[in-house]
Amino acid sequence: MKTVLAAAILFFSFFSTPAFSAAIEARIDLSRQEMKVYQYGRLKHVWKVSTARRGYKTPTGTWRPTRMYREYYSKKYYNSPMPHSIFFYGGYAIHGTGSIKSLGRPASHGCIRLHPGNARTLFNMVKRVGPRNAKVRIVR
């Protein structure tokens, strides 16, 4: 009986470890205009972001990255540069911005803007583990 109980505890503790969650998780809080980046369940970075300004929308939910580009230019907004883009839902992406003074308040057309250095760091973290092992979670 003790052997069965020990095996059951070991079995269930294995499935509750961070190995079964995303290796990299970017959690964006729209009300705080903040991103927290977790690596294997541990907080690694806290960064200011800019999300959708009035009249635009940043979606809420959880996704995996779908496409990644070191250099990308918006097809919708005047060929604007979007360095280190991580697309997660249609045309919505996390990317670097030249408008660093607006970080910490809503300013975008819906994407999540980061300081260019932070966008590069996140991009490289996701690239290292692969998009299938990363998660983007956006909450209000």
Model-derived segments and spans:
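A structural motif detector for short, solvent-exposed N-terminal "entry" segments of globular domains
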Residues: 20-54
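General beta-strand recognition
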Residues: 34-36, 64, 93
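Active-site-proximal flexible loops/turns
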Residues: 9, 36, 74
